[in-house]
Amino acid sequence: MAALFIVLEGIDGSGKTTQGDLLLAHFQRQGLAAVLSPEPTNGPVGRLIRQALQGDLFTYNDARQFEAQMGYLFAADRHYHLYHPGDGVEAKLAQQCHVITTRYYFSSLAYNCHTEADWEFVQRLNQSFPQPDWVIYLDLPVDLALQRLGDRQQLEDQAPRECYEQREKLISVHRNYDRIFAHYQGQLCRLDASLPVEQLHQAIITKVEEML
């Protein structure tokens, strides 16, 4: 059985990290080799991305220039994520280790695109990257996502939201995800992310068992 490359996608607050952790634990209970490998990574470019999203790194004030800048950074980090000789996705798959990633190039299309020119630009940056075996899209209404983000902010001592965790931005991102997955030709599982955590986990497990 070949190792699987599974991508969890969704807007901020949709539960990708939680479900990624639960899926990793499921694989481990089954005695299967697996890693959870999120984007952005903890590599050098990934750290720059986090600084930019938190406002701690110079970025352009113009929205389109900012998204173009982020598009380049995410693509560079994605290349590192895929092809790092020790911990990269390709290396892990070659070792028969399942790879779960929270976010992939779909996120770049969803977050960094506002016009058709943006779509073409981001697609060019990511066109050489391999397709995942499965995409699990955690679909969540924006209002519920904002509620969850607010709750999380309180738990984290009022840490400021990242620039992508704003209502207007999330509405645009959700719309872009709808566009992406309406035309996606690969293997896709779209799930209701408003379900309780355990119920959503079981739905993911059911789908994963079909993949194996």
Curated annotation (Swiss-Prot):
Superkingdom: Bacteria
Positions contributing to ATP binding: G10, I11, D12, G13, S14, G15, K16, T17
Keyword terms, alphabetized: ATP-binding, Kinase, Nucleotide biosynthesis, Nucleotide-binding, Transferase
Record PROSITE patterns: THYMIDYLATE_KINASE (PS01331)
EC number: 2.7.4.9
Catalytic activity annotation: dTMP + ATP = dTDP + ADP
Pfam family, one: Thymidylate_kin
Listed GO MF terms: ATP binding; dTMP kinase activity
InterPro entries with a match to the protein in the record: P-loop_NTPase (IPR027417), Thymidylate_kin-like_dom (IPR039430), Thymidylate_kin_CS (IPR018095), Thymidylate_kinase (IPR018094)
GO cellular component, one term: cytosol
GO terms for biological process, alphabetical: dTDP biosynthetic process; dTTP biosynthetic process; dUDP biosynthetic process
NCBIfam families, per database record: DTMP_kinase (TIGR00041)
Family: Belongs to the thymidylate kinase family.
Function field: Phosphorylation of dTMP to form dTDP in both de novo and salvage pathways of dTTP synthesis.
Entry protein name: Thymidylate kinase
Organism from which the protein derives: Synechocystis sp. (strain ATCC 27184 / PCC 6803 / Kazusa)
